[in-house]
UniProtKB/Swiss-Prot annotation:
Residues 1-19 form the signal peptide. This is Probable endopolygalacturonase NFIA_008150. The active site is at residues 215, 237. PbH1 repeats lie at residues 147-169, 170-200, 201-222, 247-273, 281-303. Residues 20-35 form a propeptide. GO terms for molecular function: polygalacturonase activity. Pfam families: Glyco_hydro_28 (PF00295). Keywords: Cell wall biogenesis/degradation, Disulfide bond, Glycoprotein, Glycosidase, Hydrolase, Repeat, Secreted, Signal, Zymogen. Belongs to the glycosyl hydrolase 28 family.
Amino acid sequence: MLKLIGSLVLLASAAEVIASPLAESVAPSITLEKRASCTFSGSNGAAAAMASQKACSTIVLSNVAVPAGTTLDLSDLADGTTVIFEGETTWGYKEWSGPLLQISGKNIKVEGASGATLNPDGARWWDGQGGNGGKTKPKFFAAHGLTSSSSITNLHILNTPVQAVSINGCDGLTVTDMTIDDSAGDTQGGHNTDAFDIGSSSNIIISGAKVYNQDDCVAVNSGTGITFTGGLCSGGHGLSIGSVGGRSDNTVENVSFTNSQVTKSDNGLRIKASKGKTGTIKGITYSGITLSSIRKYGILIEQNYDGGDLKGDPTSGIPITDLTMENISGKGAVASSGHNIAIVCGSGACSNWTWKNVEVTGGQTYGSCENVPSVAQC
């Protein structure tokens, strides 16, 4: 009997040894299983999508109605997730600071399906004051921390309460064929409807954007390796660097605006260095830009920005170096009450500029230019 029991024990041990490699070989198939593709819609779609971020490789938001006072927060996505907007995405009304939409992650792909719109219906907040008073208005889209070749493609954004897209803490992000249409704000009190505010980001490409708004088309406040190309900017404040200075990050380097149009805007091209502050503005290029219907300044470069343009004596704490202005077409572009080009630099603070084939006319000559590099015109 004891002999039989011993034999059974030996057989059981052998079975364990034989079985264990098979158990190990099964485990990887579980970890490699693909996550699901998920579609969310209606008034409960936002909450369901937010709760399912790690479970879905593709998140489709189809006619989602986001409740008032809620951020559609997709900042915890699994690496490599695709987010697709279908139909009309809407937001309920509440006075608060937002954002209404937030997306973050590595290698994230955000896409707008054909005919899709993201419509926060900003006219409900517009009162002509923007972020300076009146109703508390939510910012729209916080594209923060998008890295590792993330992309945003074919989004159509309609009527933002104030600022449309904030790009911050991003590296390697490409934005293609985005439309931001706040044109209704021209007559309904839209204000501070910046299209792209960029800070502390690197290696950003914005291509083929169409912007209709009442503030900066692009404002690069800090960052390196930023490109805006093939864009249309209408109704706002033009293509801007800054204001630079007085922030936690005050370096702007290697920024290019190319092959774009600025029309029906207060300014065409603008570089703003804050008076009395420190920082760096280096390697900025404006090339192949067409200006038309500019109300105030065709080109404005100032080192005395102080909450407004051209305020008092310029300072030298934020040098503007290695600036290139080339192939700027603006014949008759500036209103007769405006100024073609205004350059106000601190002593020795504007240097190593390139200025080729720049024609901006129609307005007045600015009579208070200071410390203009010899190659430039003012």
